[in-house]
């Protein structure tokens, strides 16, 4: 029989007492009362914060949105099929944040910045809150630099500046995404980081956008955030904030960024779904009362930063889909009032072959000519006036039988100017070529060209100037203005090419 040594036992006990750790880890936990439709009701969690991340037993993460007297309503960032009534929930003490960094450029990620393009993990050492506060008044300066879209009708008449919020609004299938993608393509070589956020889109549509950007070499400066139509409402609601957060990283490091939200109507619908399931009181069109705040806090994050903060910028192009052209519906009017102007795309113009189908009459930029180079200001003012007069005359001419010669000439020029604004998809024009094109139109050089030949003539003219008269393009690019010398060279080049075109025709 083994003899027990009391000294040994006492030394073991003493050692264990010395090593005993008195620290107590307090964890805020709760119990699932009810789960379904992407919503969980939790008993307990008395100290939960609004917007705090919650961790369920199966690893699913949720966000505490409703803090009620006897339970917490949380939205799930996953399907939550393996969460059961009575399972434990742990409050993490954290607010939703995502990793950020340079390595995200060229990648496709989801609303939690996790890669979904099959190209492996994204290395990152920094994180940023998804819901970051917008820059204050002192942190900003007024918009003064142009952000060229490459579309003649936008850059000439509805100019967008770096740091502006310009809404793209129109019915389905009117080319809203095409305008946004062309703007991304036109940022090549401009040192602008683009973020395209796809909310509730078909996976095939997102794949098409990715392939268009890859074919044109635009993925080298673009990040895509995608939450498809089959994603939980919570992730569709978060996706735009994730896009803004990724762009903010570059903005605060003194870079220029462009963010496209395609589209915010679907984000509002996802938020409505979440709110109704959380039993929040419905308002107009069954949207919750804070749906305006949903969009305003997102779009206010777009800014042109002050010199002290490095003069970075975030330009936002939110997209809104209307039903049968109704811009007076709830969400469209909300976003129109938040943004600095809107580009209105018309189904009638689209169907009549005018593409991009931009209705110049009701589209507006509230930044205006501050976001244009001098050369564009010199030629674009006349273009807008001529088109406005043409629209008025065209409506009148439908009822008048005999028109005088001056009116006929004005109508003929208006039709040619309308032709000048047509552009093929994925073929944005550099600003110097736009100036040349508009100059030819407003100064009557197209009046003798048949309407059906205008596009062919302008394409040939641009090609002729690039190959034979490159000094014109170089002068406009360097001086950002049409000097008398450049104007003389433009007149000469247009007249020379007209002879070449007439001989070829």
From Swiss-Prot:
<protein>
    <recommendedName>
        <fullName>ATP synthase subunit alpha, chloroplastic</fullName>
        <ecNumber>7.1.2.2</ecNumber>
    </recommendedName>
</protein>
<keyword id="KW-0793">Thylakoid</keyword>
<dbReference type="InterPro" id="IPR023366">
    <property type="entry name" value="ATP_synth_asu-like_sf"/>
</dbReference>
<dbReference type="Pfam" id="PF00306">
    <property type="entry name" value="ATP-synt_ab_C"/>
</dbReference>
<dbReference type="InterPro" id="IPR038376">
    <property type="entry name" value="ATP_synth_asu_C_sf"/>
</dbReference>
<dbReference type="GO" id="GO:0045259">
    <property type="term" value="C:proton-transporting ATP synthase complex"/>
</dbReference>
<keyword id="KW-0934">Plastid</keyword>
<keyword id="KW-0067">ATP-binding</keyword>
<keyword id="KW-0139">CF(1)</keyword>
<keyword id="KW-0813">Transport</keyword>
<dbReference type="InterPro" id="IPR036121">
    <property type="entry name" value="ATPase_F1/V1/A1_a/bsu_N_sf"/>
</dbReference>
<dbReference type="InterPro" id="IPR004100">
    <property type="entry name" value="ATPase_F1/V1/A1_a/bsu_N"/>
</dbReference>
<dbReference type="GO" id="GO:0009535">
    <property type="term" value="C:chloroplast thylakoid membrane"/>
</dbReference>
<feature type="binding site">
    <location>
        <begin position="170"/>
        <end position="177"/>
    </location>
    <ligand>
        <name>ATP</name>
    </ligand>
</feature>
<dbReference type="GO" id="GO:0046933">
    <property type="term" value="F:proton-transporting ATP synthase activity, rotational mechanism"/>
</dbReference>
<dbReference type="InterPro" id="IPR033732">
    <property type="entry name" value="ATP_synth_F1_a_nt-bd_dom"/>
</dbReference>
<dbReference type="Pfam" id="PF02874">
    <property type="entry name" value="ATP-synt_ab_N"/>
</dbReference>
<comment type="similarity">
    <text>Belongs to the ATPase alpha/beta chains family.</text>
</comment>
<keyword id="KW-0547">Nucleotide-binding</keyword>
<keyword id="KW-0066">ATP synthesis</keyword>
<dbReference type="InterPro" id="IPR020003">
    <property type="entry name" value="ATPase_a/bsu_AS"/>
</dbReference>
<feature type="site" description="Required for activity">
    <location>
        <position position="363"/>
    </location>
</feature>
<dbReference type="GO" id="GO:0043531">
    <property type="term" value="F:ADP binding"/>
</dbReference>
<dbReference type="GO" id="GO:0005524">
    <property type="term" value="F:ATP binding"/>
</dbReference>
<comment type="subunit">
    <text>F-type ATPases have 2 components, CF(1) - the catalytic core - and CF(0) - the membrane proton channel. CF(1) has five subunits: alpha(3), beta(3), gamma(1), delta(1), epsilon(1). CF(0) has four main subunits: a, b, b' and c.</text>
</comment>
<keyword id="KW-1278">Translocase</keyword>
<dbReference type="InterPro" id="IPR027417">
    <property type="entry name" value="P-loop_NTPase"/>
</dbReference>
<keyword id="KW-0472">Membrane</keyword>
<dbReference type="Pfam" id="PF00006">
    <property type="entry name" value="ATP-synt_ab"/>
</dbReference>
<dbReference type="InterPro" id="IPR005294">
    <property type="entry name" value="ATP_synth_F1_asu"/>
</dbReference>
<keyword id="KW-0150">Chloroplast</keyword>
<keyword id="KW-0375">Hydrogen ion transport</keyword>
<dbReference type="InterPro" id="IPR000793">
    <property type="entry name" value="ATP_synth_asu_C"/>
</dbReference>
<keyword id="KW-0406">Ion transport</keyword>
<comment type="function">
    <text>Produces ATP from ADP in the presence of a proton gradient across the membrane. The alpha chain is a regulatory subunit.</text>
</comment>
<dbReference type="InterPro" id="IPR000194">
    <property type="entry name" value="ATPase_F1/V1/A1_a/bsu_nucl-bd"/>
</dbReference>
